Regions:
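Bacterial N-terminal signal peptides that target proteins for export
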Residues: 2-14
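Sec/Tat signal peptide C-region and signal peptidase I cleavage site
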Residues: 23-29
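Surface-exposed, charged secondary-structure patches
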Residues: 103-105, 111-165, 215-223
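Surface-exposed, polar/charged faces of alpha-helical domains
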Residues: 37, 52-55, 59, 92-96, ...
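Non-transmembrane domains of secretory- and envelope-associated proteins
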Residues: 185-223
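Early exported N-terminus immediately downstream of N-terminal targeting peptides
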Residues: 31-117
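Bacterial N-terminal signal peptides
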Residues: 13-22
Length: 223
């Protein structure tokens, strides 16, 4: 499966998605936390989990996978993202294939995120969170059900900042969920869609799922 071009950009998206989902809690007396609060809240818990850790991702990747599953994954709607990624092919998939694809796609993204952080320590990640990320104010009408939270990532060595957008929607449970990430206008969903469509045309939906299973199993053996 040709992930090379997609993965280079998605590694950046992955790192940002892991680190941006939190930076401190902003408490508001509202029934439903704002999208910005959701973005700001989560990694306060990530910071708490990391602050006393001396390990790198390479030392104990399973710890970081578990951290992502516990604190990051719940804020994404992977089924909705999967529907958007597969587009017209989603309805062609059987119920079992849909479930399998969602699970494998989620696993692919989480492992891509963690792998992108492989050489960094918990302290490195914490410093990055605290020093280089700025979640911009978000204005939206009270009735809004879709909101884009803009994030500015300070450039390295005086370079230009990276503009990032988290696309959130309000679900039926009145909870804000992420269903796409954009970095400098490049969408995670759109990027993967182009790659997956090529795989489906070559080997069908099941062929794509089988390749994702193989890729994820291989990633699990990489320490």
């Amino acid at each position: 499966m040709d992930y090379n071009r997609v993965t280079k950009r998605l590694l950046v998206m992955g790192v940002m998605a892991l680190t941006i989902l939190g930076l401190g809690v902003i408490a508001q007396a509202t029934t439903i936390p704002s999208p910005r609060d959701v973005v700001l809240d989560t990694s306060q818990r990530v910071l708490e989990a990391l602050k006393n850790q001396q390990i790198t991702v390479a030392d104990d990747p399973e710890y970081f996978y578990g951290l992502a599953d516990e604190l990051i994954v719940p804020h994404f709607n992977f089924r909705r993202m999967s529907q958007r990624v597969l587009g017209k092919y989603w309805r062609q998939a059987t119920d079992e294939q849909q479930v399998d694809f969602v699970n494998q796609f989620r696993q692919l993204l989480v492992r891509t995120y963690v792998t992108a952080l492989y050489k960094y320590s918990a302290k490195d990640i914490t410093n990055f969170l605290q020093e280089r990320i700025k979640v911009l104010p978000t204005n939206y009408p009270p009735e809004a059900t879709r909101v884009n939270v803009k994030v500015l990532v300070e450039g390295q060595n005086g370079g230009p900042p990276i503009n990032m957008i988290l696309n959130l929607y309000l679900n039926k449970e009145k909870t804000w969920k992420v269903d796409d990430i954009q970095v400098e206008g490049v969408s995670l969903v759109t990027n993967y869609r182009a790659t997956f469509y090529r795989e489906i045309r070559a080997g069908g939906i099941q062929g794509l799922i089988d390749k994702l299973v193989s890729r994820n199993q291989h990633a699990m053996t990489m320490k």
